[in-house]
C-alpha cells in the first residue's frame, strides 16, 4: 500500500460501520476487492493476527483432550440430505458441485456449510465400544454458505475461511451435557486471552442449531450496540447418532446409540477483538495476538546516530531471543509518521531510544492502549517489556468488561426494551413459552438472544406477554 494511502484519515470510531470497513483496509487486515461477493483476501498482516489467534484456540483445545484432524470439503448429496431437521436449516445456503469438468456427476457434492454430515459417516466406522469415549476431534477449515444478506468482512461471509469446529462423541446424554459445559468454559478462556468479555446464554428453541437438543452461545456487544455471535456449543443428543447409525457396545454388551456435541468459533473472534479494543487511531491489539508486539523507534540527531541505531538493534536482538515479536523502524519517515503507522497497526508497545536515553541507559516506553509514557531500564528491557504486556492485557480486559456492563439494561416492560436495545442489550422477564417469546420479539423488533447461563434473576416478576409469574430473565438485542 502506498504511503499516501496509509496517511488517509480513519473515520471516528463512533461512526462504527465506516470505521470498521476503513480499518480493515488501512491496517492491512483484509482486502475486499476480490471479484466474488462475500469472499475476501487476508493481507499478510491480518493473516498473522489470525495465526496468533488460532494458536491460542489450538493450545486450549489440545490441552483439554481434543485432537486436530481434517475432513474433506465435499459432501455427497445422499449423506448431506440424511438429517432432515439439520438440512432445513442449511438447504438455502448450500453451494453444489454438479459437474466434474464437462461431465455431470452421478451424485452432486455439497461444499460444506458445516461438517456434521461429512464427519459422522466416519464416526460410524470409528466408534465401536464405550472404551472409545470421549472422542473429541476438531478441525480448522473453510466453509461455504450462500449468504443472501448483506455480507461483511469477518462478520458475514460466503466463505468462512477460519472455521474451528469440534465434534465429540459420548456414551450418555449427561456426558455430552458435561462436554457442553466444558466447551463453554474453554471458549470463555479463549476470549479472556483476547481480552473480550462475553455474554453466555442458552438460545431459545426456535433459534437453536438445526438437529440439536439445545444450543448455548457466546456473544460480544459491538461498539454500535449490536451483538455478534462469536461461539456456539450444541448438545446433539442422540439425534445424529440415530441418523448415521453411530452405536457403541456398552459394558453390559448391549448396543446403544452414542450422544454427541459440536461447537464452533470463526474469524468473528477477530472481528470482535479489533472492534472492541480499537480506537480513533486504529487497531489496539492484545499483546498475545499482535504480529508486532514492540516497535523500536530510533530518535536521531546529527550527533550519535550510529550509537542509537546500534543500541536499537541490540535491544531488538535481546527481545527476539526472549520470544518477543519486535521491529526496528529505521525508515526515512518522520517520527510522527512512524507513530501513525504503528498505532494504526495496533502495536502494543513503542520503545523510543535517542542519545539522551542512551546516556541514562533507558528506553522511553509508550503504551498503545492508554498512551502512557515512562521509562524502562535497558539493563532489564526483557522483564520490563513483559510487565508492560501484562498491564496492557489486564487493562484491556477490565476496560472492555466495564463497557460491556454499561451496555446491559434490566428493563421492566417491552417499550423500555425497544428503547434500550439501541444502546446495547436488554434483559426482560420471560415465562419460557414459545408463543410469548415470539410475541415479544415481534413487538420489540429484535430477537431474544437467550437465557443467561449466569442468571440475572430479580425474584418473581411477570412475563410482559402473558402476565405469568417467572424468575427467568432473557437477553434481548439487535444482532449481526
UniProtKB/Swiss-Prot annotation:
It comes from Methanosarcina mazei (strain ATCC BAA-159 / DSM 3647 / Goe1 / Go1 / JCM 11833 / OCM 88) (Methanosarcina frisia). This is Proline--tRNA ligase. It catalyses: tRNA(Pro) + L-proline + ATP = L-prolyl-tRNA(Pro) + AMP + diphosphate. Keywords: Aminoacyl-tRNA synthetase, ATP-binding, Cytoplasm, Ligase, Nucleotide-binding, Protein biosynthesis. The gene is proS. One of its GO terms (molecular function) is proline-tRNA ligase activity. Consists of three domains: the N-terminal catalytic domain, the anticodon-binding domain and the C-terminal extension. One of its GO terms (biological process) is prolyl-tRNA aminoacylation. Homodimer. It comes from the Archaea. Disulfide bonds: none annotated. The keyword Transferase does not apply.
Amino acid at each position: 500500500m502506498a504511503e499516501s494511502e496509509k496517511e488517509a484519515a480513519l473515520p471516528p470510531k463512533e461512526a462504527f460501520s465506516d470505521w470498521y470497513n476503513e480499518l480493515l483496509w488501512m491496517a492491512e487486515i483484509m482486502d475486499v476487492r476480490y471479484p466474488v461477493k462475500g469472499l475476501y483476501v487476508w493481507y499478510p498482516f491480518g493473516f498473522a493476527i489470525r495465526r496468533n489467534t488460532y494458536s491460542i484456540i489450538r493450545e486450549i483445545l489440545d490441552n483439554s483432550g481434543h485432537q486436530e484432524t481434517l475432513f474433506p470439503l465435499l459432501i455427497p448429496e445422499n449423506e448431506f440430505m440424511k438429517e432432515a431437521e439439520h438440512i432445513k436449516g442449511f438447504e438455502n445456503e448450500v453451494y453444489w458441485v454438479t459437474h466434474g469438468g464437462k461431465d455431470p456427476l452421478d451424485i452432486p457434492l455439497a461444499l460444506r456449510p458445516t461438517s456434521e454430515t461429512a464427519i459422522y459417516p466416519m464416526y460410524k466406522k470409528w466408534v465401536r465400544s464405550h472404551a472409545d469415549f470421549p472422542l473429541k476431534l476438531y478441525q480448522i477449515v473453510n466453509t461455504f454458505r450462500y449468504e443472501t444478506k448483506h455480507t461483511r468482512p469477518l462478520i458475514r461471509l460466503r466463505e468462512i475461511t477460519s472455521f474451528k469446529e469440534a465434534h465429540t462423541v459420548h456414551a450418555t446424554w449427561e456426558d455430552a451435557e458435561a462436554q457442553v459445559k466444558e466447551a463453554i468454559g474453554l471458549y470463555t478462556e479463549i476470549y479472556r486471552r483476547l481480552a473480550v468479555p462475553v455474554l453466555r446464554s442458552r438460545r431459545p428453541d426456535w433459534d437453536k442449531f438445526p438437529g440439536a437438543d439445545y444450543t448455548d452461545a457466546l456473544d460480544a456487544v459491538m461498539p454500535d450496540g449490536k451483538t455478534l455471535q462469536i461461539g456456539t456449543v450444541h448438545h446433539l443428543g442422540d439425534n445424529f447418532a440415530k441418523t448415521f447409525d453411530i452405536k457403541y457396545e456398552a459394558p453390559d454388551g448391549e448396543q446403544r446409540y452414542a450422544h454427541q456435541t459440536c461447537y464452533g468459533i470463526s474469524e468473528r473472534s477477530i472481528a470482535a477483538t479489533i472492534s472492541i479494543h480499537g480506537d480513533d487511531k486504529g487497531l489496539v491489539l492484545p499483546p498475545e495476538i499482535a504480529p508486532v508486539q514492540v516497535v523500536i523507534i530510533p530518535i536521531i540527531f546529527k550527533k550519535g546516530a550510529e550509537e542509537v541505531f546500534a543500541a536499537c538493534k541490540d535491544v531488538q536482538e535481546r527481545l527476539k531471543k526472549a520470544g518477543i515479536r519486535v521491529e526496528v523502524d529505521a525508515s526515512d519517515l518522520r517520527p510522527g509518521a512512524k507513530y501513525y503507522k504503528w498505532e494504526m497497526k495496533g502495536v502494543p508497545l513503542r520503545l523510543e531510544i535517542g542519545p539522551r536515553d542512551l546516556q541514562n541507559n533507558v528506553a522511553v516506553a509508550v503504551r498503545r492502549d492508554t498512551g502512557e509514557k515512562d521509562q524502562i531500564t535497558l539493563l532489564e528491557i526483557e522483564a520490563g517489556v513483559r510487565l508492560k504486556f501484562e498491564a496492557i492485557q489486564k487493562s484491556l480486559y477490565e476496560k472492555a468488561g466495564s463497557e460491556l456492563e454499561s451496555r446491559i439494561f434490566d428493563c421492566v416492560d417491552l417499550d423500555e426494551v425497544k428503547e434500550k436495545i439501541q444502546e446495547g442489550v436488554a434483559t426482560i422477564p420471560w415465562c419460557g413459552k414459545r408463543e410469548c417469546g415470539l410475541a415479544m420479539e415481534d413487538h420489540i423488533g429484535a430477537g431474544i438472544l437467550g437465557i443467561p447461563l449466569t442468571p440475572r434473576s430479580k425474584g418473581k416478576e411477570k412475563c410482559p406477554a402473558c402476565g405469568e409469574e417467572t424468575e427467568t430473565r432473557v437477553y434481548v438485542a439487535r444482532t449481526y
